[in-house]
């Protein structure tokens, strides 16, 4: 396995670790509605950071974006909006299925759809089946899916042991939402594929290969921001128990506390895709679809490890922890299989 591929896998791991930890600052926000908290964090992660970093990277910010036709930018934006819809459905999936089953089904579907649809759309899937390296990477995707399933089972055992139940368990509604979440969340993978002309243009301007994907985030995350912020603002305006004005009428120290924590959560959320771009740049072009598989499987892996570190599994008993550990090992094995496949 080459150093470039190894570093690509490593950066995807770092990005996934940030994704697994980003919600920790949000949990310390006090006396704010979820909608206000999510909006503040989202403005940082989806608008401020993508624009600021792109302004630093590009020699002429406006000239870069105006150089693309609407036919180039619109698919990138719409796939970003598609991902935004999946982001909202994610929370509803947890509500009706519970954390473990919801995450397992949603992540499993988005891993498959986001990973395999790109080569199918590009007409490269037959190449993967007919080459040794391609078959090896597909095997890695299958093993990763098995690992996600094992971790999901560990979560179910934990919830059963600790008496944790879904907020409003509804299998039919939850499964529909989980499938929708999985499919729509893959929009980020499709957006990255659609944004290749933007990456190439950034490279032509002399942007470092590690950073060429970052300017496209202005468009991708702009699409996601409109969906997420629109959802939050509509709820803040229509739901009687929610009030943006009330949330910002608290004591100034508490407002500052909440804004800083929400901004930190937004920063950590953004960093997952900052390092995703670094990892994506190191993956061989013919296997760039694997970036999504690495990100999602490592997200599950890091989520399990973070849960252990935060002692969330302390009262779950030995069996759930053993199953979780097995699932984490399987995901690590999957990453190595994919790495070997890409090297071939």
Curated annotation (Swiss-Prot):
The gene is rhaT. It comes from the Bacteria. Its main location: membrane. It is found in: Cell inner membrane. Keywords: Cell inner membrane, Cell membrane, Membrane, Sugar transport, Symport, Transmembrane, Transmembrane helix, Transport. The chain crosses the membrane at residues 4-24, 38-58, 68-88, 101-121, 137-157, 175-195, 214-234, 259-279, 290-310, 323-343. This is L-rhamnose-proton symporter. GO terms for cellular component: plasma membrane. It is a multi-pass membrane protein. Uptake of L-rhamnose across the cytoplasmic membrane with the concomitant transport of protons into the cell (symport system). One of its GO terms (molecular function) is rhamnose transmembrane transporter activity.
């Amino acid at each position: 396995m080459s150093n470039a591929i190894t570093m690509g896998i490593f950066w995807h791991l770092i990005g996934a670790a940030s994704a697994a930890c980003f919600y920790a600052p949000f949990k310390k926000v006090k006396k704010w509605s979820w909608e206000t908290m999510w909006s503040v964090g989202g403005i940082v992660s989806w608008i401020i950071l993508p624009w600021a970093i792109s302004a630093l990277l590009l020699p002429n910010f406006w000239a870069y974006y105006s150089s693309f036709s609407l036919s180039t930018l619109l698919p990138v934006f719409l796939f970003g909006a598609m991902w935004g819809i999946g982001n909202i459905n994610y929370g509803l999936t947890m509500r009706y299925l519970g954390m473990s089953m919801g995450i397992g089904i949603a992540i499993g579907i988005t891993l498959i759809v986001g990973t395999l649809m790109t080569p199918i759309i590009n007409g490269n899937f037959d190449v993967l089946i007919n080459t040794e390296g391609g078959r090896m990477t597909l095997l890695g995707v299958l093993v990763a899916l098995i690992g996600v399933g094992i971790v999901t089972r560990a979560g179910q055992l934990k919830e059963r042991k600790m008496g944790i139940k879904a907020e409003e368990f509804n299998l039919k509604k939850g499964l529909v939402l989980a499938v929708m979440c999985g499919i729509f969340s893959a929009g980020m993978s499709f957006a990255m594929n659609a944004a290749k002309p933007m990456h190439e243009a950034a490279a032509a301007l002399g942007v470092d290969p590690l950073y060429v994907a970052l300017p496209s985030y202005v468009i991708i995350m702009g699409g996601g921001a409109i969906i997420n912020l629109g959802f939050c603002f509509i709820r803040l305006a229509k739901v009687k128990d929610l009030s943006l004005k009330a949330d910002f009428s608290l004591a100034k120290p508490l407002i500052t506390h909440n804004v800083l924590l929400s901004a930190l959560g937004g920063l950590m959320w953004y960093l997952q895709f900052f390092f995703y771009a670094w990892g994506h740049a190191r993956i061989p072009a013919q296997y760039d679809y694997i970036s999504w598989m690495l990100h999602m499987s490592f997200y599950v892996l890091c989520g399990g490890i973070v849960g252990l570190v935060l002692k969330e599994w302390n009262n779950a008993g030995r069996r759930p922890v053993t199953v979780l550990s097995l699932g984490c090992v399987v995901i690590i094995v999957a990453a190595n299989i994919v790495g070997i496949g890409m090297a071939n």
